């Protein structure tokens, strides 16, 4: 509970961005995250822009934040970045209910997720 004892340190050629409390299930978020893993950031941004999934816009926002972190905080070249990791985790689950027939009560779970995107600079081979 609380803070991690040893937070993960990023390498010299990496940058990271996190989004927490995303209002979607981890399973649905992982479908979009799997779509961009290992791709160049330009191609990943294009894929997210034209995706029909609702959560794709939030993933795009997190990826743009990771790119900005790489450029401004780590002085990395944006044209040589790839999506090294797109990690999805489970967050809290809001529990709601709905009255059902014969006096019963149906449980409704409203899951939240978190997303961590790591971008890495790779040198192009000629």
Swiss-Prot record:
This is Large ribosomal subunit protein uL22. It holds the Pfam family Ribosomal_L22. GO terms for biological process: translation. Belongs to the universal ribosomal protein uL22 family. InterPro entries: Ribosomal_uL22, Ribosomal_uL22_bac/chlpt-type, Ribosomal_uL22_bac/org-type, Ribosomal_uL22_sf. PANTHER family: CHLOROPLAST 50S RIBOSOMAL PROTEIN L22-RELATED (PTHR13501), LARGE RIBOSOMAL SUBUNIT PROTEIN UL22M (PTHR13501:SF8). GO terms for molecular function: rRNA binding; structural constituent of ribosome. The keyword Nucleotidyltransferase does not apply. Part of the 50S ribosomal subunit. It comes from Ruegeria pomeroyi (strain ATCC 700808 / DSM 15171 / DSS-3) (Silicibacter pomeroyi). Keywords: Ribonucleoprotein, Ribosomal protein, RNA-binding, rRNA-binding. It comes from the Bacteria. One of its GO terms (cellular component) is cytosolic large ribosomal subunit. This protein binds specifically to 23S rRNA; its binding is stimulated by other ribosomal proteins, e.g. L4, L17, and L20. It is important during the early stages of 50S assembly. It makes multiple contacts with different domains of the 23S rRNA in the assembled 50S subunit and ribosome.
